[in-house]
């Protein structure tokens, strides 16, 4: 079941796509703030949450998001907001169906998982695959309780962690080029990274050069999970980006 807010058909749709291991519940803070003005959809990606029985592939995930936009988005179009794994899926959707995507915001996804960059993806997959699930689940729960307030952590716990699906997803990303896909999307894009996300920040300029109409944003005092570390700042960026798109398209 895809979580959604507001049935007002005049409100632009935003589809939020979560990161590896998490679920659509990772966007609870953004939906709470943005649901007043936007129709928000927070699907679980294949291999995760309610879709954990569906094997993850980049193309398969993109096709499911495209089908969701066709089925649920107002006017059959949406702004895509993706973090990490969700950012890569969002890029894939925008490249294949640009007419369905009015804007593209990606966070922590400005590196092609190839060559040396692929080592980080492979390494995390190995850890999640080899460490017993009860152990890694305990570590994740400890981390989220320590790092985030209950208003953020508890919905994530309720949505569940999908470690096996995360392993498959990480390995599916390896060897895939996403900057050319970003270049194929002619619409506006917003590239977001956390100040302390030193894995994705160095290659952000290359992604910005590839994008047709890019904007860049750095979220201070944030790591890779920028929407959770600084939820208010992240939400303000998305509201401003989405509002600008609506204004430029003649939609208030």
What are these regions (language model features)?
Residues 214-252:
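Catalytic active-site module of serine/aspartate enzymes centered on a nucleophile-bearing elbow/loop
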Residues 91-96, 101-131:
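Flexible "cap/lid" loop of the alpha/beta hydrolase fold
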Residues 82-86, 90:
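Gly/Ala-rich beta-loop-alpha elbow adjacent to hydrolase catalytic centers
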Residues 115-116, 133-184:
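Conserved alpha/beta-hydrolase catalytic His-Asp/Glu region
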Residues 2-52:
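Conserved HGGG/HGGXW glycine-rich cap/lid loop of the alpha/beta-hydrolase fold
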């Amino acid at each position: 079941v895809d979580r959604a807010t507001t049935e007002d058909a005049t409100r632009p749709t935003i589809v939020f796509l979560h990161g590896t291991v998490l679920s659509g519940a990772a966007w609870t803070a953004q939906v709470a703030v943005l649901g007043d003005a936007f129709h928000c959809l927070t699907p679980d990606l294949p291999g995760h949450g309610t879709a954990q029985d569906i094997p993850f592939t980049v193309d398969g995930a993109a096709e499911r998001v495209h089908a969701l936009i066709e089925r649920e988005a107002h006017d059959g179009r949406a702004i895509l907001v993706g973090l990490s794994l969700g950012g890569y899926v969002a890029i894939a959707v925008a490249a294949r169906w640009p007419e369905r995507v009015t804007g593209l915001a990606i966070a922590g996804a400005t590196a092609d998982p190839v060559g040396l960059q692929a080592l980080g993806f492979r390494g995390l997959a190995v850890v999640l695959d080899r460490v017993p699930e009860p152990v890694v689940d305990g570590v994740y729960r400890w981390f989220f309780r320590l790092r985030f307030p209950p208003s953020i952590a508890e919905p994530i716990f309720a949505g569940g962690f999908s470690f096996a699906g995360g392993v498959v997803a990480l390995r599916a990303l390896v060897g895939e080029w996403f900057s050319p896909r970003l270049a194929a999307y002619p619409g506006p894009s917003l590239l977001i990274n956390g100040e302390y996300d030193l894995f994705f920040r160095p290659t952000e300029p290359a992604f910005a050069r590839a994008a047709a109409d890019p904007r860049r944003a750095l979220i201070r005092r944030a790591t890779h999970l920028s929407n959770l570390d600084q939820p208010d700042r992240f939400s303000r960026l998305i509201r401003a980006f989405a509002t600008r798109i609506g204004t430029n398209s003649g939609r208030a």
